[in-house]
Amino acid sequence: MSLPASFDLTPEDAKLLLAANVHLGAKNVQVHNKPYVYKTRPDGMNIINIGKTWEKIVLAARIIAAVPNASDVAVCSSRTFGQRAVLKFAAHTGATAIAGRFTPGNFTNYITRSFKEPRLVIVTDPRTDAQAIKESSYVNIPVIALTDMDSPSEYVDVAIPCNNKGKHSIGLIWWLIAREVLRLRGIIPDRTTEWSVMPDLYFYRDPEEVEQNAAEEAKTEEVEEAPVAEAETEWTGETEDVDWADSGATPAAEDAAASNW
């Protein structure tokens, strides 16, 4: 059975997936994830078939694009590495982001202020986002999940096999899904046109590391500005205007003229 051309993984996307370690799976394999294993390394780590990862990304994007109202898609991430990614995904596609702890009753208890009725739920990790998946099963909401080889597949309708523990892997998968959704909606005209948003925007950034880098940049700027400021004050020093008439001193030219040669 031949698949459409959109399901073919391009060399550029394959390089991105390998560079972000999307292919590095867990050592344990859940029975439903066995078809996604390419091979097992001598150290026991399972290598994920990135061709099947890409096929599931395209399938998930088609499901997302089929939802008429973009805000009816809820994207969840209790895992820290995925919170920035889901927020960026929501900003670019119009979905509803639930970053951080999932409040129990979000999908089932209509009395709560945070009550939502999405038509589709996407989670970063079936283990950390188990509450969201469980509530989705109660109200018949389909679930798309980023699954590692050891992730449970109960109540998951579409599993995207990938490394869902690395910050670069999680960010890249969300970026690829967002790009594919925008292609299907026609915002990105065709597959030859590159998306202006870089994958780095979806990667998790440690707040302490960001503050440290900002402080170091500020220090280097101060060190560079200090010599320039000293040089400016040295050359722009104002000279005092002296009134020679008040001081009683006569100019040298008058002294020479008055003297008898």
Swiss-Prot record:
PANTHER family: 40S RIBOSOMAL PROTEIN SA. Residues 222-244 have a biased composition (Acidic residues). Required for the assembly and/or stability of the 40S ribosomal subunit. Required for the processing of the 20S rRNA-precursor to mature 18S rRNA in a late step of the maturation of 40S ribosomal subunits. GO terms for cellular component: cytosolic small ribosomal subunit. Keywords: Acetylation, Cytoplasm, Ribonucleoprotein, Ribosomal protein. One of its GO terms (biological process) is ribosomal small subunit assembly. This is Small ribosomal subunit protein uS2. Residues 210-261 are annotated as: Disordered. The modification N-acetylserine is found at residue 2. One of its GO terms (molecular function) is structural constituent of ribosome. Pfam families: Ribosomal_S2. The keyword Cytoplasm applies. The gene is RPS0. SUPFAM superfamilies: Ribosomal protein S2. Disulfide bonds: none annotated. Belongs to the universal ribosomal protein uS2 family. InterPro entries: Ribosomal_uS2, Ribosomal_uS2_CS, Ribosomal_uS2_euk, Ribosomal_uS2_euk/arc, Ribosomal_uS2_flav_dom_sf. Component of the small ribosomal subunit. Mature ribosomes consist of a small (40S) and a large (60S) subunit. The 40S subunit contains about 33 different proteins and 1 molecule of RNA (18S). The 60S subunit contains about 49 different proteins and 3 molecules of RNA (25S, 5.8S and 5S). Interacts with RPS21.
